[in-house]
Amino acid sequence: MKLKNTILLLLLFSSIIIIIGCSKTVPKTPLEFQKELLAGTSAYLNTQRTWQLDSFYVDGINFPLTPLQKGYKKTFSYDGLYSDSEMNTGKWEIQTLGKLKQTIIYKTTNKQDSSVFDIVSINAARLNLNIKLSNGKLGSYSFKISN
């Protein structure tokens, strides 16, 4: 009886070790990881991220922000929807690593516009974007996490 219990216990223990040892966690691709840093993971209470404008540079020259500009926020939802603190809405997508495409519908005019930003850097607390402005200069936006 004692031998039978020992064998069953060993079998159970071995099965648990095999199950735990063989379970795999599939690593995220850099593209998936970048999307999750921007907009959340879709897990409970992590379905969107709000970013607040922190600084703005043109060709490396700092442009001091007004109080209104300091309050500007962009919200990216995990499902690809976009909104901002000026009540504009739209969509976002990252199809290529480091390239953020925003399609915005402006509330005041109901017109649609698209822009592609270079994602210079992104982490859980900061988002830095570059875009070529209409005058040919480089605009650099720095955002901090707001939510």
What are the residue ranges of the model-derived segments?
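C-terminal motif of bacterial Sec signal peptides marking the signal peptidase cleavage site
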Residues: I18-G21
